[in-house]
Amino acid sequence: MTNHSVILCILDGWGNSENSQFNAIAQSYKPCWDNTILQYPKSQLITHGLNVGLPDGQIGNSEVGHVNLGSGRIVLQDLCKINNEIKYIKNNRYLLEFIKKIKQNNGICHIAGLLSDGGVHSLHTHMLDIIDTLSNFQIQIAVHIFLDGRDTPPISAIKYINILREHIKHLNNVNIATISGRYYSMDRDNKLDRTRTAYKAMAFADAKRYTDPSLAIQDSYNAGITDEFILPCVIGDYNGMNPQDGFIMTNFRSDRAIQIIKMIIGDIKTDNHITLENTIGMVKYSESINIPCLFPNNNITNTLGEVIANHKLHQLRIAETEKYAHVTFFFNGGREDTFENEDRIIIPSPSVTTYNLMPEMSAKEVTNTVIERIKLQKYSLIILNYANADMVGHTGNIEATKQAITALDQCLNKILNCIQGTNYVLVITADHGNAEEMFDVKNNMPYTAHTLNPVPFIICNYSKQIRLKNGRLCDVAPTILEILNIEKPKEMTGISLIEYI
């Protein structure tokens, strides 16, 4: 091993695009960045489709990006795995056991999930396939719909409602029970008041009632509320859950499923509570959630974090709340426990309704803490995530996103200044694009989703003369190991992108 240490700085949602129109990054004031891309070796990384273990053409996301970054290999993602296996769902032993308990208890089945073709947290066809299988067992099914508007256009929910209604129109035992914007039903930031609002509608039918989901959605549109933020409401004569019922979550991404599931199974209590013990998920969401899953996860070994730990080196993971799981759980390939000599720091995200109201988020606090830890000269590897470009980009507010980019630029400048004269090498990249495309010209509305654009890959303050090849996210870990002069394990099929001059 050499005396080099590495800081991997992940600029979440920072993509490259030659088109400056509606590009918050290109239009922002960022003198440090502009100088950095001229001064240091740079290339680009692919973040979508087959190159990250997703279906061809599927937009990448933060979970997928961090799994690939940390694993050093293309990891087959849950979306692909479920697409391959759901055709056999009627024979799935976990689902059959779930159904058996419902029938024994004379309960109904509650099925909930994000009704979206975004492919980030869910895929609507998975829900439809499971509904078909459940309906064949002659049990009553209540569907709880989470509305997207973030990985899909902000005003598109009625399209997906109509797809569902067309699919179930001949199924007399299936009814839409509630709808809720994902802002409430899929919070991950411990803003439990949001989760409780969704839970009360689902568990007790305690929300405004509509005869038709499309009417509820249109009412929200008329009030200027887009899909993501639609208040939970009850549909038709739905009257709530009972303890003998079953609950199935069709989201396959864990971070935004955890809070609502913990409320359903009673791990997070409310003033009034109904606990559904017969609960099942698509995947293993967390070691702290003890429920079965339809599609068990594969174990990923010899990730970057594990290799660092095996060499008895110290490492640090740091991010604000919104991205903390990404630099820990996801970066470690789905492992919740820390490795030996792995420190973790979570900086609270600001308590605001949406992050366009505070574009700087907690980047300054993250930066100050990182600088304190750099000065300790303790860590061989520091992994940090800046959430701003992604989280503010998701609001669709280009002016706020430009402010977020400027705030990030100031943070990068502080870190670069801090490592001058040290053995730290700063590796800058992103997990996917977002902030470089802020408007959907085709639909004439703000663009709030991720992009298919490549992301930057820059190496700063390295003592050797190099150039960088273009690559994929899975090539980042092998590149870092080369800088650290650590042999790449055989499980890592990515390659180092360094070419020595």
Curated annotation (Swiss-Prot):
<feature type="binding site">
    <location>
        <position position="431"/>
    </location>
    <ligand>
        <name>Mn(2+) 2</name>
    </ligand>
</feature>
<dbReference type="GO" id="GO:0030145">
    <property type="term" value="F:manganese ion binding"/>
</dbReference>
<feature type="binding site">
    <location>
        <position position="182"/>
    </location>
    <ligand>
        <name>substrate</name>
    </ligand>
</feature>
<dbReference type="Pfam" id="PF01676">
    <property type="entry name" value="Metalloenzyme"/>
</dbReference>
<feature type="binding site">
    <location>
        <position position="323"/>
    </location>
    <ligand>
        <name>substrate</name>
    </ligand>
</feature>
<dbReference type="InterPro" id="IPR011258">
    <property type="entry name" value="BPG-indep_PGM_N"/>
</dbReference>
<dbReference type="InterPro" id="IPR017850">
    <property type="entry name" value="Alkaline_phosphatase_core_sf"/>
</dbReference>
<feature type="binding site">
    <location>
        <position position="450"/>
    </location>
    <ligand>
        <name>Mn(2+) 1</name>
    </ligand>
</feature>
<feature type="active site" description="Phosphoserine intermediate">
    <location>
        <position position="62"/>
    </location>
</feature>
<dbReference type="Pfam" id="PF06415">
    <property type="entry name" value="iPGM_N"/>
</dbReference>
<comment type="subunit">
    <text>Monomer.</text>
</comment>
<comment type="similarity">
    <text>Belongs to the BPG-independent phosphoglycerate mutase family.</text>
</comment>
<feature type="binding site">
    <location>
        <position position="390"/>
    </location>
    <ligand>
        <name>Mn(2+) 1</name>
    </ligand>
</feature>
<dbReference type="InterPro" id="IPR006124">
    <property type="entry name" value="Metalloenzyme"/>
</dbReference>
<dbReference type="InterPro" id="IPR036646">
    <property type="entry name" value="PGAM_B_sf"/>
</dbReference>
<dbReference type="InterPro" id="IPR005995">
    <property type="entry name" value="Pgm_bpd_ind"/>
</dbReference>
<feature type="binding site">
    <location>
        <position position="121"/>
    </location>
    <ligand>
        <name>substrate</name>
    </ligand>
</feature>
<feature type="binding site">
    <location>
        <position position="188"/>
    </location>
    <ligand>
        <name>substrate</name>
    </ligand>
</feature>
<feature type="binding site">
    <location>
        <position position="62"/>
    </location>
    <ligand>
        <name>Mn(2+) 2</name>
    </ligand>
</feature>
<feature type="binding site">
    <location>
        <position position="432"/>
    </location>
    <ligand>
        <name>Mn(2+) 2</name>
    </ligand>
</feature>
<keyword id="KW-0479">Metal-binding</keyword>
<dbReference type="GO" id="GO:0006007">
    <property type="term" value="P:glucose catabolic process"/>
</dbReference>
<keyword id="KW-0324">Glycolysis</keyword>
<comment type="function">
    <text>Catalyzes the interconversion of 2-phosphoglycerate and 3-phosphoglycerate.</text>
</comment>
<keyword id="KW-0413">Isomerase</keyword>
<keyword id="KW-0464">Manganese</keyword>
<protein>
    <recommendedName>
        <fullName>2,3-bisphosphoglycerate-independent phosphoglycerate mutase</fullName>
        <ecNumber>5.4.2.12</ecNumber>
    </recommendedName>
</protein>
<dbReference type="GO" id="GO:0004619">
    <property type="term" value="F:phosphoglycerate mutase activity"/>
</dbReference>
<feature type="binding site">
    <location>
        <position position="12"/>
    </location>
    <ligand>
        <name>Mn(2+) 2</name>
    </ligand>
</feature>
<feature type="binding site">
    <location>
        <position position="394"/>
    </location>
    <ligand>
        <name>Mn(2+) 1</name>
    </ligand>
</feature>
<comment type="pathway">
    <text>Carbohydrate degradation; glycolysis; pyruvate from D-glyceraldehyde 3-phosphate: step 3/5.</text>
</comment>
<dbReference type="GO" id="GO:0005829">
    <property type="term" value="C:cytosol"/>
</dbReference>
<feature type="binding site">
    <location>
        <begin position="253"/>
        <end position="256"/>
    </location>
    <ligand>
        <name>substrate</name>
    </ligand>
</feature>
<dbReference type="GO" id="GO:0006096">
    <property type="term" value="P:glycolytic process"/>
</dbReference>
<feature type="binding site">
    <location>
        <begin position="150"/>
        <end position="151"/>
    </location>
    <ligand>
        <name>substrate</name>
    </ligand>
</feature>
